[in-house]
């Protein structure tokens, strides 16, 4: 049994510890782990992680990356490898935290390539079989010697498939996170049983548009690269591309997936003959990705609330998502939520300037807004068919005392399309954390 390093990111608060699993179910044919190699300055925080496929050397992989024009070196290198290999034969991920290796010029590209080279060598992979990710401070070169020295140590002594190995891996990719984000799930397709495991990091600089958030999930289901890429893109659009903490899109946003087929069964592809199995897997991965993405919002820097923006009866999914995003990214709305202020005018303002597809996408006279408590108690109407309600401020205050809240907007267009978006409030603590980030 390889060694594991028990380490908590910080002293976990009662709130944070609720979201860290005490056990999990893990897919066959993988080994993971994390160690401290010296990127982080405190001398102990885990900052290097590896995930390895141990079932043959021909796993399928897929990736969705940031559209920020200042793409970090590891993003560029991983995209290139995925494209060159058409998603086939990717067998490991290597990740460092504490330094983003972004806007680091030619040296940054060489460092990312060297991380791939050394990882492939120590894991006895074919050339360019690893994807590389980095997260942390932008604009500084990696302490590459420490990372390249840590990779062999991690690979030879600290990889395994126990729950603690997965917790170490999840911890090692964190920066300002207050808890490691890990989700596992077992599901069936027909007579075959498969497992998903996923982890991600993120608490600030979160407003992804992957057409300093990292995530990866793996399964032992047999899936072709093209099917996995399509499913991942669909799932990310409805999960990681539907969250926001602060409206800032990172240079390093990356979500990758791997499927090694270790659990056997019929290969899942995107042909019509496999439509039922494909659809079932897609539904499982969408639900799984949403669970992971919501953990990022729950760990939003300084956040005290987890808010679901639910837009219903839109003309199109695009309209519904755009309106939900507009509200979720509104600093005025988010600060009102922190202040427990039922200022629904800020919600209407954000609806009104959302980027929608037609003049009929939003009709004020048909628009309704309400607060929906998650405890099943009575909702609170704020606006009904464009007419303001006499708001019970005491009831509003009661609802806003809760950590979780649903803000539901019904556009009344008879289009029948809906979208959810997840956000948090914006607090004084967010400013403190980010003002002190590099100190």
Swiss-Prot record:
<keyword id="KW-0511">Multifunctional enzyme</keyword>
<keyword id="KW-0028">Amino-acid biosynthesis</keyword>
<feature type="binding site">
    <location>
        <position position="301"/>
    </location>
    <ligand>
        <name>substrate</name>
    </ligand>
</feature>
<comment type="similarity">
    <text>Belongs to the ArgJ family.</text>
</comment>
<comment type="function">
    <text>Catalyzes two activities which are involved in the cyclic version of arginine biosynthesis: the synthesis of acetylglutamate from glutamate and acetyl-CoA, and of ornithine by transacetylation between acetylornithine and glutamate.</text>
</comment>
<dbReference type="GO" id="GO:0004042">
    <property type="term" value="F:L-glutamate N-acetyltransferase activity"/>
</dbReference>
<keyword id="KW-0808">Transferase</keyword>
<feature type="active site" description="Nucleophile">
    <location>
        <position position="212"/>
    </location>
</feature>
<keyword id="KW-0496">Mitochondrion</keyword>
<feature type="binding site">
    <location>
        <position position="434"/>
    </location>
    <ligand>
        <name>substrate</name>
    </ligand>
</feature>
<keyword id="KW-0068">Autocatalytic cleavage</keyword>
<dbReference type="Pfam" id="PF01960">
    <property type="entry name" value="ArgJ"/>
</dbReference>
<feature type="site" description="Involved in the stabilization of negative charge on the oxyanion by the formation of the oxyanion hole">
    <location>
        <position position="135"/>
    </location>
</feature>
<comment type="pathway">
    <text>Amino-acid biosynthesis; L-arginine biosynthesis; N(2)-acetyl-L-ornithine from L-glutamate: step 1/4.</text>
</comment>
<feature type="binding site">
    <location>
        <position position="201"/>
    </location>
    <ligand>
        <name>substrate</name>
    </ligand>
</feature>
<feature type="site" description="Involved in the stabilization of negative charge on the oxyanion by the formation of the oxyanion hole">
    <location>
        <position position="136"/>
    </location>
</feature>
<dbReference type="GO" id="GO:0006526">
    <property type="term" value="P:L-arginine biosynthetic process"/>
</dbReference>
<feature type="binding site">
    <location>
        <position position="439"/>
    </location>
    <ligand>
        <name>substrate</name>
    </ligand>
</feature>
<dbReference type="GO" id="GO:0004358">
    <property type="term" value="F:glutamate N-acetyltransferase activity"/>
</dbReference>
<comment type="pathway">
    <text>Amino-acid biosynthesis; L-arginine biosynthesis; L-ornithine and N-acetyl-L-glutamate from L-glutamate and N(2)-acetyl-L-ornithine (cyclic): step 1/1.</text>
</comment>
<dbReference type="InterPro" id="IPR002813">
    <property type="entry name" value="Arg_biosynth_ArgJ"/>
</dbReference>
<feature type="binding site">
    <location>
        <position position="175"/>
    </location>
    <ligand>
        <name>substrate</name>
    </ligand>
</feature>
<dbReference type="InterPro" id="IPR042195">
    <property type="entry name" value="ArgJ_beta_C"/>
</dbReference>
<keyword id="KW-0012">Acyltransferase</keyword>
<keyword id="KW-0055">Arginine biosynthesis</keyword>
<dbReference type="InterPro" id="IPR016117">
    <property type="entry name" value="ArgJ-like_dom_sf"/>
</dbReference>
<dbReference type="GO" id="GO:0006592">
    <property type="term" value="P:ornithine biosynthetic process"/>
</dbReference>
<dbReference type="GO" id="GO:0005759">
    <property type="term" value="C:mitochondrial matrix"/>
</dbReference>
<feature type="site" description="Cleavage; by autolysis">
    <location>
        <begin position="211"/>
        <end position="212"/>
    </location>
</feature>
<comment type="subunit">
    <text>Heterodimer of an alpha and a beta chain.</text>
</comment>
<feature type="binding site">
    <location>
        <position position="212"/>
    </location>
    <ligand>
        <name>substrate</name>
    </ligand>
</feature>
<protein>
    <recommendedName>
        <fullName>Arginine biosynthesis bifunctional protein ArgJ, mitochondrial</fullName>
        <ecNumber>2.3.1.35</ecNumber>
        <ecNumber>2.3.1.1</ecNumber>
    </recommendedName>
</protein>
């Amino acid at each position: 049994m390889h060694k594991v390093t028990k380490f908590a990111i910080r002293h976990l608060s009662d709130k944070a510890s609720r979201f860290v699993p005490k056990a999990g179910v893990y897919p066959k044919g993988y080994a993971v782990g994390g160690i401290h190699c010296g990127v982080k300055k405190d001398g102990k925080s885990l900052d290097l992680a590896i995930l390895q496929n141990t079932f043959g050397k021909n796993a399928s992989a897929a990736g969705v990356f940031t559209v920020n024009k200042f793409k970090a070196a590891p993003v560029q290198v991983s995209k290139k490898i995925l494209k060159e290999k058409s998603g086939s034969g990717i067998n490991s991920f290597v990740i460092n935290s504490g330094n983003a290796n972004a806007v680091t010029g030619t040296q940054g590209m060489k460092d990312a390539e060297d991380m791939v080279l050394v990882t492939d060598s120590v894991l006895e992979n074919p050339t360019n079989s690893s994807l590389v990710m980095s997260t942390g401070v932008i604009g500084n070169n990696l302490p590459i010697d420490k990372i390249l020295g840590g990779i062999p140590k991690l690979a030879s002594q600290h990889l395994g498939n126990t729950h603690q190995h997965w917790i170490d891996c999840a911890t090692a990719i964190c920066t300002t996170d207050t808890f490691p984000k890990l989700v596992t799930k077992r599901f069936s397709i027909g007579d075959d049983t498969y497992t998903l495991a996923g982890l991600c990091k993120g608490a600030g600089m979160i407003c992804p548009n992957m057409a300093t958030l990292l995530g990866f999930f793996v399964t032992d289901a047999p899936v072709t690269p093209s099917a996995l890429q399509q499913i991942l893109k669909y799932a990310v659009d409805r999960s990681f591309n539907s969250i926001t903490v602060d409206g800032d899109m990172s240079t390093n946003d990356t979500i990758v997936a791997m499927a090694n087929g270790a659990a056997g069964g019929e290969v899942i592809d995107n042909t019509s003959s496999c439509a039922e199995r494909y659809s079932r897997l897609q539904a499982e991965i969408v639900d799984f990705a949403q669970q992971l993405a919501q953990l990022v919002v729950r760990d939003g820097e300084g956040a005290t609330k987890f808010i679901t923006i639910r837009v219903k009866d839109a003309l199109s999914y695009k309209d519904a998502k755009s309106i939900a995003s507009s509200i979720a990214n509104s600093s005025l709305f988010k600060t009102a939520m922190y202040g427990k202020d039922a200022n629904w005018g800020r919600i209407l303002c954000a609806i009104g300037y959302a980027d929608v597809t037609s003049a009929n996408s939003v009709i004020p006279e048909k628009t309704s807004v309400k607060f929906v408590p998650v405890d099943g108690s009575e909702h609170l109407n704020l606006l009904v068919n464009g007419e303001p309600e006499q708001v019970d401020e005491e009831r509003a205050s009661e609802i806003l005392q809760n950590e979780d809240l649903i803000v539901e907007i019904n556009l009344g267009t008879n289009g029948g399309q809906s979208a959810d978006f997840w956000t948090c409030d914006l607090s004084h603590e967010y400013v403190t954390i980010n003002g002190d980030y590099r100190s």
